[in-house]
């Protein structure tokens, strides 16, 4: 099989570009040479906050990328076209129209790999009748649609693919020596916090990590309010324990960044030992590893409209962290049945309750084992390769 991957890799860094890089690395590094990969790095945006905008510069770049794709088709006989479709955003869907109008006639099979949700729902509820017609004409009937979880089969089905398969996102194991090093440190911190909670030890800080786009709909402000509420509970019980929220990521909206900074100065987010919320900005790979290694729990209380399968959740699982996550779209599907860390959306009180329950404990739900079974790059590679090669037998 000859596969053209028409999708961009970092920069800018976000879940979609990260997973495209994982796909390329996995298919190219494998001893299995049954898939020959060609890549058009179709980067249009310089920064994350530029992703949803439209401009003549982007149109020119897109036309150039399409010409390169057609040239690779004619020069190397590449006959399978891999593409990451837009979420339900009008400008992004129009981009997809242009790509398919120019490229689709040259390729035998079209493969969609959804890294964001909502295009099917948008076609039904947000698109004009003529937009639905054009979308079905240009985007409909792909040979294969790859989705991140069973929850998204219905959304992908709106474009009438011949086949839909589920392939979760992945990450390389960041701590293969987890049992010998990181787990030991986590157990020691949990023991110290347990002693502080029982009144028999010095002050201990429980670190909760938020690692995502800094955006209200991702649950950032709910996490902030939850940490304020939980610290108030601990202070009322006169316990020598505190909870600190470490926030890492770029802000999507300047107004929300201003609101966040103003919130940090309020009395309920500061105690005699310092701030209870620490903002670290965008975390590069080294900083991210540092924050995950020192964290005692992870929170992502998202109700983001286009939420898919956050890579940060996979990395938190790989680090064996207890996780608080919302019952939103695909997110519960990623966790073991009956997982105790699930909360409703927009519920800071529930987040505080779950974090309170995690104090002095390490992960008891086997989330690292969940990562090793389902979300490693090896598991991803096996599933994605099987899905792609199955097209050859049709």
Where are these regions (language model features)?
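Conserved donor-binding/catalytic core segment of Leloir-type glycosyltransferases
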Residues: 4-5, 183-218, 224-229, 246-249
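Donor nucleotide-sugar binding/catalytic pocket of nucleotide-sugar-dependent glycosyltransferases
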Residues: 133-196
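Nucleotide-activated donor-binding/catalytic signature segment of Leloir-type glycosyltransferases, i.e.
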Residues: 249, 258-286
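Conserved acidic donor-binding segment of nucleotide-sugar-dependent glycosyltransferases
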Residues: 337-348, 356-362
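A charged, aromatic-enriched C-terminal amphipathic alpha-helix characteristic of glycosyltransferases
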Residues: 360-392
């Amino acid at each position: 099989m000859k596969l053209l991957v028409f999708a961009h890799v970092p920069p800018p860094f976000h879940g979609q570009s990260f997973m495209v890089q994982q796909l390329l690395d996995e298919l190219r590094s494998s001893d299995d040479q049954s898939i020959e990969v060609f890549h058009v790095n179709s980067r249009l945006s310089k920064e994350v906050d530029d992703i949803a905008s439209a401009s003549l510069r982007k149109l020119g770049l897109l036309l150039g990328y399409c010409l390169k794709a057609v040239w690779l088709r004619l020069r190397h006989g590449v006959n399978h076209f891999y593409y990451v479709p837009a979420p339900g955003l009008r400008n992004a869907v129009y981009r997809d129209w242009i790509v398919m109008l120019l490229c689709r006639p040259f390729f035998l099979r079209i493969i969609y790999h959804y890294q964001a949700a909502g295009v099917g729902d948008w076609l039904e509820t947000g698109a004009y009748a003529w937009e639905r017609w054009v979308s079905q004409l240009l985007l409909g009937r792909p040979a294969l649609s790859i989705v991140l979880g069973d929850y998204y089969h219905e959304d992908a089905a709106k474009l009438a693919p011949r086949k839909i398969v589920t392939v979760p996102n992945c990450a390389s194991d960041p701590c293969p020596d987890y049992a010998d090093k990181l787990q030991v440190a986590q157990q020691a911190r949990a023991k110290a916090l347990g002693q502080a909670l029982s009144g028999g030890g010095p002050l201990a800080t429980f670190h909760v990590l938020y690692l995502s786009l800094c955006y209200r709909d991702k649950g950032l402000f709910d996490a902030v309010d939850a940490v304020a509420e939980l610290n108030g509970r601990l202070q009322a019980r006169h316990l020598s324990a505190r909870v600190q929220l470490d926030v890492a990521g770029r802000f999507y909206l300047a107004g929300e960044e201003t609101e966040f900074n103003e919130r940090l100065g309020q009395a309920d987010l500061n105690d005699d030992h310092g701030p209870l919320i620490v903002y670290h900005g965008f975390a590069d790979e080294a900083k991210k590893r540092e924050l995950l290694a020192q964290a005692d729990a992870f929170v992502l209380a998202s109700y983001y409209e286009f939420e898919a399968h956050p890579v940060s959740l996979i990395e938190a699982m790989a680090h064996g962290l207890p996780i608080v996550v919302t019952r939103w779209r695909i997110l519960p599907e990623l966790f073991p049945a009956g997982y105790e860390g699930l909360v409703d959306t927009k519920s800071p009180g529930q987040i505080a309750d779950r974090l309170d329950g995690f104090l002095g404990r390490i992960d008891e739900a086997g989330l690292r084992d969940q990562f090793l079974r389902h979300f490693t790059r090896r598991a991803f590679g096996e599933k994605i390769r099987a899905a792609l090669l199955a097209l050859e037998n049709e």
